[in-house]
Structures are given as structure tokens and as C-alpha cells.
Amino acid sequence: MAPSVDSEVIGSFRRLAREPLPYAPDLVVEKWRSTASGLTVLWAQFDNPLLNAYITVASEIFTDSGVPHTLEHLVFLGSQQYPYKGVLDSLANRAFAQGTNAWTANDHTAYTLTTAGSDGFLRMLPVYCDHVFFPTLTDAGFVTEVYHINGKLEDAGVVYSEMQGR
């Protein structure tokens, strides 16, 4: 079946396509794009107590500097509206979420959100998006999360330690 396009509009989002999955024809996926920001959203609705979101941003670089992985970690340390470490984890606990997580691939970084029920999901999503799109990038965050030399004069930092384990 060819995707249908009816250009329904909700707020600043316009539906671009609506198509059933070939391997699950009862599951229809919709593609929406914000006319304000260009943000693209893929949406599938089905009966399930868990809600999932994958906030995926392009992060391809052509060096092995580790900048996307570093940024992935720094995002969780705060945002412009919520400039405190741990805000997302506190919200996740109250939303019956499975915590916060992310991964970095060759060309993108994906931030995940899974909650039980829509109430917590709808409370968490704007805060999570603020962290992803407007992170506080501080020297202190870099020293704590990425790289520093500890009191024993050893290389340390969460990102540094992760990369040493590979």
C-alpha cells in the first residue's frame, strides 16, 4: 500500500505520510514535521502500557575525537531551563521510567525514554528535549564527566574510563 498524505496539521506539526508497516499491517506509522523547527517525528500508536521515545540527532564527525560521545554524557548534566545534574533521573523515578540512557553510533546519537503510562511521559518529554537541545556545557561538567586527573595522579573521568574499557 502506498503511503497516504493528507497534510493534517496539529499545532506547528504537519503530517507528511501515514503508512502501515509491511510486516505488521495493523500497525500504522505516521511521519510528522514541525513547520517551526524542522523536527521530524515518527509516530506509531498501539496498545501497550509502555511509551517509548528515541530522540535521535545527527552527530557524525570524521575524526576519532569522541566529541559526540562526550556530548552525549554532558547532556545529562543539565539544561538551560533545568541547570542541575539529576533532574532527569528524579523525573524518571516519578514517571515509572526505566531511567535515562543514550548511545552514540557512527552518524547519530540516540537518547531513549521509556515510561509506564502517558502522564509521566508527557511530563518528562519536554524536560528531556530541553536537555538534548539546550544542554549546559560547563568546565565543571567536563572535568567531572569526561576527563580529569584524580588525587592519585591517575587519568580519570566517566567517558575516559568507558573508552579505556573498549
Where does each model-flagged region fall?
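Secretory-pathway/luminal and periplasmic proteins that interact with or process carbohydrate-rich
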Residues: 81, 98-102, 134-139, 165
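M16/insulysin-pitrilysin zinc metalloprotease superfamily fold
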Residues: 78, 113-151
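A structural signal for the main folded, soluble domain(s) of proteins
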Residues: 4-12, 24-29, 60, 65, ...
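Hydrophobic, small-residue-rich alpha-helical packing segments that form membrane-like cores
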Residues: 145-166
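Residues that form generic nucleotide/phosphate-binding pockets
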Residues: 91, 131, 162, 166
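M16/MPP (pitrilysin/insulinase) zinc-metallopeptidase core fold and M16-derived inactive scaffolds
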Residues: 45-124
